[in-house]
Amino acid sequence: MSTEKINLLDFDRKGMRELFAQELGEKAFRADQVMKWIYHFGVDDFDNMTNINKQLREKLKQKCEIVAPVVSEAQHSSDGTIKWAMRVGDQDVETVYIPEEDRATLCVSSQVGCALECKFCSTAQQGFNRNLKVSEIIGQVWRAAREVGLEKETGRRPITNVVMMGMGEPLLNMKNLIPALEIMLDDLGFGLSKRRVTVSTSGVVSGLDQMTGKIDVALAISLHAPNDKLRSEIMPINDRWDIQDFLASVRRYIASSNANRGKVTVEYVLLDHVNDGTEHAHELAQLMKDTPCKINLIPFNPYPGSPYKKPSNSRIDRFQKTLMQYEHTVTIRKTRGDDIDAACGQLVGDVIDRTKRTAMLKAAKGETIEVKAL
């Protein structure tokens, strides 16, 4: 397939209409028709778009293509979770399907690897190679929807929620993240509710400020420590934007958002005898008193070579109860897919060059910001 062809998965509705007008000489409604075929029916063959005239189909075949990541490996958990390794170029990223009684969530990657070097995250230990294209982000959703299929055919629940919590820091890939989110929300795309699409960030303040007022989705923040000293030890990004800078940016976003209903989800991974003491719980409760939130506790998911351990159930329970004394809403995330290394912090994928982290961060400066070498 010619590399010169235009991948239609790289365009949101506005971009698709512009493409059809400028490159194909076609009206906007034709672009809308093609988007419906791609996202409503999972069609990637122009000949199967039966309400498109033959002349346009031939033009599309000559100039365009519909190419999503392909599944190179699938692992099925005993709890119904599926982890797909999806091939992007000559590398793999990981995408996870998590079915529940009332919904099915897809965890999507935004980068090949991750540059932020959070000490407790398996992905971060693999290095960073590049940002994913729009087609490689939305293509994970497209491919997963095809793999899951219709409920009546496979018995699997269709995807109802998307969380940008896979490999990578989404807000370091703003250029491609925003169009992908637009397609997820668009009625011509996947038509998901803005409350069912969640972006998680480790604290890229400039990226979050760019999102404010631009796109409205649910926000989750990876906090993981109640003070700057500890957070900088386990999350070096805190040396660039400290907790107060981060939370101020969060409050700005929440103030402009309807999707979050005035609250942010705080993610807090519990590391045994590192950040899980009652003193940490008291400190966290005080820290969040001015930021409306719900706190999601995540017991650490071990991976080979990790220096950290999962806390005992008694320590987890004590941490939760301490927070609840302050009338915070506190949940403990149920671990899913840990038998196939698909749980939070376990995604690895296939990263070729572990030396590119700093160079790639500098290259990303033109898209968002420059994070100092961590």
From Swiss-Prot:
Subcellular location: Cytoplasm
Main location: cytoplasm
A Pfam family reported for this protein in Swiss-Prot or TrEMBL: RlmN_N
MF GO annotations: 4 iron, 4 sulfur cluster binding; metal ion binding; rRNA (adenine(2503)-C2-)-methyltransferase activity; rRNA binding; tRNA (adenine(37)-C2)-methyltransferase activity; tRNA binding
Entry's cofactor comment: Binds 1 [4Fe-4S] cluster. The cluster is coordinated with 3 cysteines and an exchangeable S-adenosyl-L-methionine.
Binding site for S-adenosyl-L-methionine: G168, E169, S200, S222, L223, H224, N301
Misc remark: Reaction proceeds by a ping-pong mechanism involving intermediate methylation of a conserved cysteine residue.
Function noted in UniProt: Specifically methylates position 2 of adenine 2503 in 23S rRNA and position 2 of adenine 37 in tRNAs. m2A2503 modification seems to play a crucial role in the proofreading step occurring at the peptidyl transferase center and thus would serve to optimize ribosomal fidelity.
NCBIfam families: PRK11194.1 (NF008396), rRNA_mod_RlmN (TIGR00048)
Binding site for [4Fe-4S] cluster: C114, C118, C121
Protein name as annotated: Dual-specificity RNA methyltransferase RlmN
Residue ranges annotated for the Radical SAM core domain, each copy included: 100-339
Domain of life from the UniProt record: Bacteria
Family label: Belongs to the radical SAM superfamily. RlmN family.
A GO-annotated cellular component: cytoplasm
Catalyzed chemical reaction(s): adenosine(2503) in 23S rRNA + 2 reduced [2Fe-2S]-[ferredoxin] + 2 S-adenosyl-L-methionine = 2-methyladenosine(2503) in 23S rRNA + 5'-deoxyadenosine + L-methionine + 2 oxidized [2Fe-2S]-[ferredoxin] + S-adenosyl-L-homocysteine; adenosine(37) in tRNA + 2 reduced [2Fe-2S]-[ferredoxin] + 2 S-adenosyl-L-methionine = 2-methyladenosine(37) in tRNA + 5'-deoxyadenosine + L-methionine + 2 oxidized [2Fe-2S]-[ferredoxin] + S-adenosyl-L-homocysteine
InterPro entries from the UniProt entry: Aldolase_TIM, Methyltransferase_A, RlmN_N, RNA_MTrfase_RlmN, rRNA_lsu_MTrfase_RlmN/Cfr, rSAM
Keywords, sorted A to Z: 4Fe-4S, Cytoplasm, Disulfide bond, Iron, Iron-sulfur, Metal-binding, Methyltransferase, rRNA processing, S-adenosyl-L-methionine, Transferase, tRNA processing
Gene Ontology biological-process annotations: rRNA base methylation; tRNA methylation
Catalytic residues, chain numbering: E94, C344
Disulfide bridge map: C107-C344
E.C. designation(s): 2.1.1.192
Cofactor: [4Fe-4S] cluster
UniProt-listed Gene3D superfamilies: 1.10.150.530, Aldolase class I (3.20.20.70)
